């Protein structure tokens, strides 16, 4: 997927804006198509179709939009070392709260990124102020299957854009920005030349408390959390734990700590997304072979873990292997190389899709500590045997110059359709250095 440079905004046009947060702008039409002001390429600059002035949606509507995009924004931002609050605020600002034509179905382009995505694009007429005059151009904008892919692509732009002097947006990364304000300041003048761009994002983040989404990508060890565990039946084989979410928690981190799946936590708490909030109470149900009724309460000043007197203890990783994604890597290739499954890789790394990015750190193997649950040990053994068997029957090929899918299918005796399915290819295009399963 080619890196698309987000062009800087035209300062001349900003003199017309009365307020940094003028989300609903009067529209301009040109030959029946939406215009983009100046040399702008982001949806923040996309003029809406002619409508009467609109008032910002009521609180329940804005919160509904925030919740709908946060479900995609948080895991993407977390896995790429970005601030979820900043990414959500950008989506709000760039898409006029999801009301811009480009951000709505069937385009789902929240950030106005130009180019094509998996071969799909939509053309809008744009106007650029060049050499003292307005020039009209037809420009393609990427079309995504959903908001999730739009967030992933925006993260890709923020992480990989490089004009020869290092990553262009590196100062906006969480590793280099101590606060979200530092990240928005780093975007000002680069992602957008509007001098008020960072302030606009900060106001949105503050007004709608978007920092609640800024928990780290894995569970922390803060001393502010607490939980209560109770075995609800004398002869029950389960124990119910009430956990209080603290800063840094994610569903994935909690699931790893307590040895249960994210899906189980979502089901037990009727959660429709992976978004959780500081102070939220979560019911955690774990397997137990104890026949006694026991209860245990951990202090609010503890490390946020419980010590229920049952035979099952939270799963604690003993060791793990982490790799940095390089060109040609795929989840399938990594699963075969490290003798695991795609589902396990996605679970370890809290991924909602099969998309990974160059430079991204991924956990590719993880061994758990001892557990009193013999069932879990048996399952792990069975899984390992199954993975080893599957790996022995496959063949992984590194693409070299001159390779084609047809040639590889002839070499391996596998149909082209099978090779494409195994490697999640949407076209016949393959890249030098790419790893492909061919058998």
UniProtKB/Swiss-Prot annotation:
Pfam families (alphabetical): Glucosaminidase, LysM
Gene Ontology biological-process annotations: cell wall organization; defense response to bacterium; division septum assembly; killing of cells of another organism
Primary residence: secreted
Keyword Signal: yes
Biased composition (Low complexity): 287-319
Alphabetized GO MF terms: amidase activity; lysozyme activity
Keywords: Antimicrobial, Bacteriolytic enzyme, Cell cycle, Cell division, Cell wall biogenesis/degradation, Glycosidase, Hydrolase, Repeat, Secreted, Septation, Signal
EC class name: hydrolase
Record's keyword annotation contains Transport: no
Signal peptide extent: 1-57
Gene Ontology CC, one term: extracellular region
Region listing for Disordered, in residue ranges: 218-241, 287-320, 372-393
Ranges where the LysM domain occurs: 241-284, 321-364, 395-438
Catalysed reactions, semicolon-separated: Hydrolysis of (1->4)-beta-linkages between N-acetylmuramic acid and N-acetyl-D-glucosamine residues in a peptidoglycan and between N-acetyl-D-glucosamine residues in chitodextrins
PROSITE patterns: LYSM
Compartment list: Secreted
EC number(s) on file: 3.2.1.17
Domain comment in the entry: The LysM domains are thought to be involved in peptidoglycan binding.
Family: Belongs to the glycosyl hydrolase 73 family.
PANTHER family for the chain: PEPTIDOGLYCAN HYDROLASE FLGJ (PTHR33308:SF9)
Function: Required for cell separation during growth.
Protein name: Probable N-acetylmuramidase
Species, as recorded: Lactococcus lactis subsp. lactis (strain IL1403)
């Amino acid at each position: 997927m080619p890196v698309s440079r987000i062009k800087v905004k035209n300062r001349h046009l900003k003199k017309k804006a009365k307020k940094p947060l003028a989300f609903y702008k009067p529209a301009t039409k040109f030959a029946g198509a939406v215009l983009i002001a100046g040399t702008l390429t982001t949806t923040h600059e996309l003029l809406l179709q002619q409508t009467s002035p609109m008032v910002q949606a009521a609180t329940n509507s804005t919160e509904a939009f925030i919740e709908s995009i946060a479900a995609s924004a948080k895991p993407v931002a977390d896995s790429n070392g970005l601030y979820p609050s900043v990414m959500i605020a950008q989506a709000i600002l760039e898409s006029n709260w999801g009301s811009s034509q480009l951000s709505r179905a069937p385009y789902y382009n929240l950030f106005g990124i130009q180019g094509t995505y998996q071969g799909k694009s939509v053309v809008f007429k744009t106007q650029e102020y060049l050499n003292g005059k307005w020039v009209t151009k037809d420009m393609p904008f990427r079309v995504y299957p959903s908001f999730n892919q739009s967030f992933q692509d925006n993260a890709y732009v923020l992480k990989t854009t490089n004009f020869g002097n290092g990553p262009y947006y590196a100062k906006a990364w969480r590793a280099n920005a101590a606060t979200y304000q530092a990240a928005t300041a780093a975007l000002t003048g680069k992602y957008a030349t509007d001098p008020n761009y960072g302030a606009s994002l900060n106001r949105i983040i503050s007004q709608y408390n978007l920092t609640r989404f800024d928990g780290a990508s894995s569970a922390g060890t803060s001393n502010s959390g607490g939980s209560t565990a109770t075995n609800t039946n004398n002869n029950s084989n389960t124990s119910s734990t009430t956990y209080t979410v603290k800063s840094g928690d994610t569903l994935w981190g909690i699931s790893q700590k307590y040895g249960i799946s994210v899906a189980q936590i979502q089901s037990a708490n009727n959660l429709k997304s992976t978004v959780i909030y500081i102070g939220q109470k979560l019911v955690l149900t774990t397997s137990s072979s104890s026949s006694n009724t026991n209860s245990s309460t951990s202090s609010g000043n503890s490390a946020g873990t419980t010590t229920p007197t049952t035979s099952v203890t939270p799963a604690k990783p003993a060791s793990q292997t982490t790799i940095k994604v390089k060109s040609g890597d795929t989840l399938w290739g990594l699963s075969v190389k490290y003798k695991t499954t795609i589902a396990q890789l996605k679970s370890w790394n809290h991924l909602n899709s099969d998309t990974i990015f160059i430079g991204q750190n991924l956990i590719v193997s993880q061994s758990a500590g001892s557990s009193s649950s013999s069932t879990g040990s048996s399952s792990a053994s069975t899984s390992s045997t199954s993975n080893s068997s599957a790996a022995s029957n496959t063949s992984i090929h590194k693409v070299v110059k001159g390779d084609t899918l047809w040639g590889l299918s002839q070499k391996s005796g596998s149909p082209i359709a099978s090779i494409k399915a195994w490697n999640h290819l949407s076209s016949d295009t393959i890249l030098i250095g790419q790893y492909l399963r061919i058998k």
